[in-house]
Amino acid sequence: MEEIKNITDITQSALAELEAITDLKDLEAWRVRYLGKKSLLTGALRNLASLPIEERKAAGAAANEAKAALEAAFLQKEQISKEKQFASRNEGLDITLPGRPWPIGRIHPLTQVTNEVTTIFSSLGFSVVEGPEIEDDYHNFEALNIPEDHPARENMQTFWIDRPNDNGRLDTLLRTHTSPMQVRYMEKNKPPIRIVVPGKVYRYEATDATHIPMFTQVEGLVVDRGISMAHLKGTLMEFCRRFFGANRKVRFRCDYFPFVEPGVEVAVSCTCGGKKECSVCHGSGWLEILGAGMVHPKVLERVGIDSEQYTGFAFGMGLERLPMLRYGIDDIRLFYSNDTRFLRQF
């Protein structure tokens, strides 16, 4: 029968072409030519409609067998071709080698330093407490013996929140130091008191290598009977020894802070050795890390603590300056740059 012979010829020709194919692109073209909607085999099937019924059945069966044979041959060839392609791509791949490690995150250096500082003071008997970052005028200034005409109240140094009180006066702000928590804690707790307060503080300052508008501070407060300047110096010297090591020089100098009397500035020797080009110490050889002093009697009296019976000391340190001194970092802005090349060193 001519139709069956035609189907057989198409099948044999298709299988011969399939055998010679080595590329997946050519294989897809073969599929369209012999198994697609407009394929040669489909064209042969259209001619069966004019045949007598018996011949049509025989030719139809032959066509279905041919199509099944071609589909099976195509799938087999496709599988073999894909395996060969995969093997050629991975010819130089050693699957016994370990995989590439996934990048692991690190704790931010400021978080590390905060944890280390609070751990040191905890071992010295201090409790760790936290306070609000949005403060009121009373706790941030007035209760700490900072009068209304003090420069720190000016808009140029304080971020005031545009929310006037009933008198039309701005009295809500982003805290300029962690010292307000001194007052809040003493309002609710009686001596003996020994606390440290870590947290973010905000000041409207020009940005440079050692100053930024938002930074981290740790406040310390001790109130008890018989507390003296010797206790303050001993505590801070011990902290500096544990954090910086015994070989680092520590300097105490008189300074003024409204909420302490007397006040001192504590500085640590710079890693540069006093070089004039140093952007951290500016050639002085020292970097101030904290201000401290004996708690002013007016501060104690405001919270109902008898300043005749109790004395205390307080200190506040900028945490960013500690790793700057320890690791020789010359720009405080690096801590907030989100540069992973810098951060993954710690």
From Swiss-Prot:
<dbReference type="InterPro" id="IPR022911">
    <property type="entry name" value="Phe_tRNA_ligase_alpha1_bac"/>
</dbReference>
<dbReference type="GO" id="GO:0000287">
    <property type="term" value="F:magnesium ion binding"/>
</dbReference>
<keyword id="KW-0460">Magnesium</keyword>
<protein>
    <recommendedName>
        <fullName>Phenylalanine--tRNA ligase alpha subunit</fullName>
        <ecNumber>6.1.1.20</ecNumber>
    </recommendedName>
</protein>
<keyword id="KW-0963">Cytoplasm</keyword>
<dbReference type="InterPro" id="IPR010978">
    <property type="entry name" value="tRNA-bd_arm"/>
</dbReference>
<keyword id="KW-0030">Aminoacyl-tRNA synthetase</keyword>
<dbReference type="GO" id="GO:0004826">
    <property type="term" value="F:phenylalanine-tRNA ligase activity"/>
</dbReference>
<feature type="binding site">
    <location>
        <position position="261"/>
    </location>
    <ligand>
        <name>Mg(2+)</name>
    </ligand>
</feature>
<dbReference type="GO" id="GO:0005524">
    <property type="term" value="F:ATP binding"/>
</dbReference>
<dbReference type="Pfam" id="PF01409">
    <property type="entry name" value="tRNA-synt_2d"/>
</dbReference>
<dbReference type="GO" id="GO:0000049">
    <property type="term" value="F:tRNA binding"/>
</dbReference>
<comment type="similarity">
    <text>Belongs to the class-II aminoacyl-tRNA synthetase family. Phe-tRNA synthetase alpha subunit type 1 subfamily.</text>
</comment>
<dbReference type="InterPro" id="IPR004188">
    <property type="entry name" value="Phe-tRNA_ligase_II_N"/>
</dbReference>
<keyword id="KW-0067">ATP-binding</keyword>
<dbReference type="InterPro" id="IPR004529">
    <property type="entry name" value="Phe-tRNA-synth_IIc_asu"/>
</dbReference>
<dbReference type="GO" id="GO:0005737">
    <property type="term" value="C:cytoplasm"/>
</dbReference>
<dbReference type="Pfam" id="PF02912">
    <property type="entry name" value="Phe_tRNA-synt_N"/>
</dbReference>
<keyword id="KW-0436">Ligase</keyword>
<comment type="subunit">
    <text>Tetramer of two alpha and two beta subunits.</text>
</comment>
<dbReference type="GO" id="GO:0006432">
    <property type="term" value="P:phenylalanyl-tRNA aminoacylation"/>
</dbReference>
<keyword id="KW-0648">Protein biosynthesis</keyword>
<keyword id="KW-0479">Metal-binding</keyword>
<dbReference type="InterPro" id="IPR002319">
    <property type="entry name" value="Phenylalanyl-tRNA_Synthase"/>
</dbReference>
<keyword id="KW-0547">Nucleotide-binding</keyword>
<dbReference type="InterPro" id="IPR045864">
    <property type="entry name" value="aa-tRNA-synth_II/BPL/LPL"/>
</dbReference>
<dbReference type="InterPro" id="IPR006195">
    <property type="entry name" value="aa-tRNA-synth_II"/>
</dbReference>
